[in-house]
Amino acid sequence: MDIKKEYERWLANATADADVAAELKTLDDAKIEDAFYRDLDFGTGGLRGVIGAGTNRMNIYTVAKASQGLADYLKKNFAEPSVAIGYDSRIKSDVFAKVAAGVFAANGVKVSIWPVLMPVPTVSFATRYLHTSAGVMVTASHNPSKYNGYKVYGADGCQITTEAAAEILAEIEKLDIFADVKYSDFEAGLANGNVKYIPDEVYAAFVNEVKNQSVLFGEEVNKDVAIVYSPLNGTGLKPVTRTLKEMGYTNITVVKEQEQPDGNFPTCPYPNPEIKEAMALGMEYAKKCNADLLLATDPDCDRVGIAVKNKAGKYELLTGNQTGMLLLDYICCQRVKHGKMPTDPVMIKTIVTMDMGEQIATHYGLRTINVLTGFKFIGEQIGKLEKQGRADSYVFGFEESYGYLTGSYVRDKDGVDGAYMICEMFSYYATKGISLLDKLDELYKTYGYCLNTLHSYEFDGSAGFAKMQSIMQAFRGNIKAFGGKKVVKLLDYAYGLDGLPKSEVLKSLLEDDCSIVVRPSGTEPKLKIYISVSAENREAAEKVECEIVKDAEKWFA
């Protein structure tokens, strides 16, 4: 691509969006290069990028081009193509959703769109419930406010496969971004019936499916739990509070500053419940209210973070690994106790999620399926079980990045489900005088202490992209040890190990049951390092983990 010529073409043609047109006129040479040096990547996660002008940005033109390519793909593969669309609270999410709807409608693809912003799992659910050919969710999940994205689901409600993504990309690459995109007005589509709003009955059916995930099986628990909840200015407020209240949890305080949808995320620039800064305001509320439990969901409500009181009365944040282990153990224990464990039960987790999950699963007779990072791979495995007539064999799936799913009604992680099940689990143990931290200690005593941490490193722009590639190559080199722990084996998933698809992931198995995993983020210009340390106790584990991090960071120089 001739960057200068493409920039000038945009100056001449990108006039429909005033923001884009104005930004184009202000770009200097360096910014022009970054905005036009490539097209936004389209893969199994769809599109994700910074909102702005250019081929490497999220804007109405890149969204329309992707939608045209998807429409062409759907028309080739379905006699009567259709799509379900949703959007979150991010900047321009509603605009992008309506642009996508207009492109689909102009191409004869029937559109069902949520009338208001909704969590990402409701798009997976609506795709399945309405039997549409595909689903589209406009979201950038937990990324900072400057990002947005375009997530694509297949007819099964699971994110598209690698093969489907390649076919859609091939259609997109045939298109000229200005000359080849068909578009009809959104309001006109509503008037002529090519675009329809998804009815309330679908939302009610989704909430009922979440409620059906309960594993109390008639047991009575104390639901007078003081809950502080934050939707982090996203989509979770109505579905989470509705579900909790309908299940008997009425003592809910919502963090006022983070209650209403706001794509600027004014109180938490990085609205990710994995990060303690995003939980800080909720923690303040919890202290003021003397809450039993703090819950927070990310903007598209597919991740849940929690905090509970320790014995000293101070609030502790639990990691995604810890919450996932607790949920897995609780669900399995309840199913076994009530005779509700299915035949050949299955637990699914990602390869960067702590191995203790597999130990817990084995204890209860579950088979563990390990998949690549990304909940789409968990959804894909649920789909395989469904095709075998064994969807009920799926018991639980989780990933360390705060994503959980307890049923097969959707094919993506569900923060509404996660929030409810965490509250139920908390109530169950509280009724017996047991805290979640007590239960966690019990699991550590049974299976051994294990510390799992995640470290992220940002590399912006084209230079940053090249730097990440060079670091990955360095980690493929002959590194003998990290933090004094010898490398026993290097697993390079770029070669498709263990029957998994090829992926840019490196895992170094270290002595003493420790490991380090390095991979580029699929959604941001970041490298992620996952460290797992087994030790006698937390203090010893933290010391080893610190030394491993120091050694790993030397390769970033």
Residue ranges and their predicted role:
Residues 36-56, 140-141, 227, 231-243, ...:
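Conserved phosphate/anionic-ligand binding catalytic regions in large, soluble enzymes, centered on
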Residues 95-104, 147-154, 302-321, 357-360:
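Short Gly/Thr/Asp-enriched flexible loops that form oxyanion-binding sites at enzyme active sites
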Residues 84-147, 246-305:
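N-terminal small/polar loop signature for handling phosphorylated ligands or for N-terminal nucleophile
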Residues 31-40, 148-280, 284-286:
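Gly/Ser/Thr-enriched, mixed-charge loops and adjacent short helices
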Residues 2-100, 107, 187-224, 235:
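An N-terminal, well-structured beta->alpha segment
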